[in-house]
């Protein structure tokens, strides 16, 4: 009896030791909260169930991924205005199967031609993300109609029908939207049109589940449909062009500009009439057989590519998933990428970015050698990509070169007041779609949201405040310039595997977007056997988040040395990271901002997989 008891004690001790070792090597794989979503014909994942269902409906009616994507952008701009409104921006990547290439559509608005740094400084104004001072031209609708015109098959009337219905007849409000309204109530009450838009006629707030209507927004969309109808006899493209022109060049634009000028914003009609969504080649890198495409250096998207190039120099599988080594090298690679982002990334219409050097594998190898596996870096220093770039030989703007980050109590206080979890107050959504033919639509729309956008009179359009991502600093590459686009955080991603369509992925989360995408992508491709076929497992695994950079949003706070970690990571792993010098804040399960929405084509079966992050109420469907 005594020997049996001793054997049990020894067995328990061995088991405890093994559990501790397993925790240090990586997390345990647990069942996902959401079931596998798989189908043969298509997959959709988006930030709201109504957005997902709108895209799904278009696919069922015979539309392609691009028709469905535009329908989702329009519906999202009605029902997700705590995250994104139609006066905001939409960054899009498309993969038309007949073209066999990825194309980038930059629906990011530009600053008015009269907006200069001196204009703001002389008036003692800043770019705080509320009101009209940080306003830029709405870009989302131009991008949406550009996609529809070039790659879609349906009319604007077809794809806008559900958005008009929800705006005119109403839809039920979700709790998240109510929370945002309550949080932003002071700002809402500053602007009469915002108050009429977001509050009941008696000034009280709606409750979750209540029906809300936006008749002014519905009317704007119907005016665009009327313009299309008047020109549809000239062809589908002519009709779509007429709808777009009515918004940017016609009576809708005139109303918006009159409102802006009345309130002292430096816009004129030409800022709208001459605006265009930029259509261009994306940038890309290859990571172990996967080709990852991102928007060019006007976005933070290439930071993901830089981090992957750095990580290719390490044996991630050998380290073990979510082990201390694995998370440490991810954090450190992101620090290096962010230092380059904050130095070199800017509007390429105004700045010659050393893009070739930044994405060079040789440069990444040099950067990887900066990583000390035993200690967290407390520096914030950009690399020098110029020797690896055949086009750029000189850099005259500010360069990150801070040798030692001191603890800053003011910064620490700001972190506790919202900066500690980037993207929780500023918001965004994402849409990922793959259809039966293999066409892919991937978009990250944002801006025009409740908390910052002024409703422009009876147009129902909430004006984007993305200008807060400029710097009012003439030494910075990403400074404010007339007709320039801010270096934005929005970052869709398309991945090909051996040249074939494989994955579309994106997320909200501000500066954190690349971190969510990076960790989810690595979960999918490096640890495929641990989750397949339930894509939700790869999405739900716990994450970390470094704050070691200048925040893109005004006033560009910093979180140097700070790391967030979800509490579902083993405590031994968190302690091991702390011993290396990472200053960890432990958040609740699913506590890191972001909501990865993903669609995937399984190359071995041809099945379409879809997944949506439980960190918010994103929703996925396949059929």
For the regions a protein language model found, what residue spans apply to each?
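Active-site rim segments in enzyme catalytic domains, especially the processed small/beta chain
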Residues: 79-95, 99-103, 263-268, 413, ...
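Bacterial N-terminal signal peptides that target proteins for export
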Residues: 2-18
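Bacterial N-terminal signal peptides
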Residues: 16-27
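Extended C-terminal subregions enriched in glycine
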Residues: 437, 484, 517-518, 527-590
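Noncatalytic scaffold domains of N-terminal-nucleophile
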Residues: 32-53, 57, 65-242, 247-299, ...
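Internal maturation/activation junctions in enzymes
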Residues: 202, 235, 253, 265, ...
């Amino acid at each position: 009896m005594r020997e049996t008891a001793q054997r049990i004690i020894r067995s328990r001790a061995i088991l405890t030791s093994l559990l501790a070792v397993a925790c240090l090597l990586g997390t345990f794989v647990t069942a996902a909260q959401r079931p596998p979503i798989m189908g043969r014909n298509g997959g959709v994942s988006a930030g709201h169930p109504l957005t997902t269902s709108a895209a799904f409906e278009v696919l069922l009616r015979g539309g392609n991924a691009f028709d469905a994507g535009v329908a989702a952008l329009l519906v999202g701009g009605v029902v997700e205005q705590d995250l994104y409104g139609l006066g905001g921006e939409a960054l899009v990547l498309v993969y038309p199967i007949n073209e066999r290439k990825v194309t980038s559509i930059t629906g990011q608005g530009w600053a008015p031609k009269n907006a200069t740094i001196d204009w703001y400084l002389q008036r003692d104004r800043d770019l705080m993300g509320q009101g009209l001072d940080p306003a830029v031209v709405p870009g989302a609708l131009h991008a949406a109609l550009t996609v529809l015109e070039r790659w879609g098959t349906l009319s604007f009337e077809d794809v806008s029908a559900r958005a008009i219905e929800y705006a005119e007849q109403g839809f039920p409000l979700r709790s998240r939207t109510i929370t945002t309204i309550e949080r932003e109530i002071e700002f809402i009450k500053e602007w009469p049109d915002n108050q009429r838009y977001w509050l009941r006629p008696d000034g009280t707030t709606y409750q979750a589940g209540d029906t809300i209507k936006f008749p002014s927004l519905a009317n704007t969309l119907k005016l665009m449909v009327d313009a299309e109808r008047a020109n549809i006899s000239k062809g589908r493209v002519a009709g779509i062009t007429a709808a777009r022109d009515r918004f940017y060049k016609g009576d809708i634009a005139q109303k918006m500009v009159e409102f802006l000028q009345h309130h002292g914003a430096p816009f004129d009609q030409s800022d709208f009439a001459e605006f265009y969504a930029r259509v261009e080649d994306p940038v890309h890198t290859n990571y172990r057989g996967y080709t990852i495409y991102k928007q060019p250096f006007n976005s933070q998207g290439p930071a993901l590519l830089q981090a992957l190039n750095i990580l290719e120099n390490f044996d991630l599988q050998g380290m073990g998933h979510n082990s201390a080594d694995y998370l440490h090298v991810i954090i450190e690679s992101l620090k290096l990428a962010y230092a380059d982002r904050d130095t070199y990334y800017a509007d390429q219409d105004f700045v010659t970015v050393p893009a070739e050097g930044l994405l060079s594998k040789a440069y990444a190898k040099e950067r990887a050698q900066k990583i000390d596996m035993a200690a967290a870096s407390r520096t914030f220093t950009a690399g020098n990509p110029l020797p690896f770039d055949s086009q750029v030989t000189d850099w005259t703007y500010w360069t990150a070169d801070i040798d030692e980050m001191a603890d800053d109590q003011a910064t620490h206080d700001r972190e506790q007041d919202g900066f500690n979890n980037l993207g929780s107050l500023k918001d965004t959504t994402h849409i990922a779609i793959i259809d039966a033919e293999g066409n892919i639509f991937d978009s990250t729309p944002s801006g025009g949201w409740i908390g910052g956008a002024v409703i422009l009179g009876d147009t129902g359009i909430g004006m984007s405040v993305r200008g807060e991502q400029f710097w009012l600093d003439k030494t910075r590459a990403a400074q404010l310039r007339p007709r320039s686009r801010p270096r934005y955080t929005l970052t869709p991603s398309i991945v090909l595997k051996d040249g074939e369509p494989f994955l579309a992925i994106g997320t909200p989360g501000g500066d954190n977007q690349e971190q969510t995408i990076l960790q989810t992508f690595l979960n999918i491709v490096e640890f495929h056997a641990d989750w397949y076929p339930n894509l939700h497992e790869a999405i739900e695994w716990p994450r970390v988040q470094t704050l070691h950079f200048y925040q893109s949003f005004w006033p560009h706070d910093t979180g140097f040395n700070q790391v967030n970690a979800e509490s579902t990571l083993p405590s031994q792993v968190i302690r091991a990271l702390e011993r290396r010098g990472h200053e960890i804040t432990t958040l609740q399960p699913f506590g890191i901002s972001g909501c990865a929405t993903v669609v995937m084509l399984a190359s071995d079966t041809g099945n379409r997989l879809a997944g949506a992050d439980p960190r918010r109420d994103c929703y996925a469907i396949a059929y």
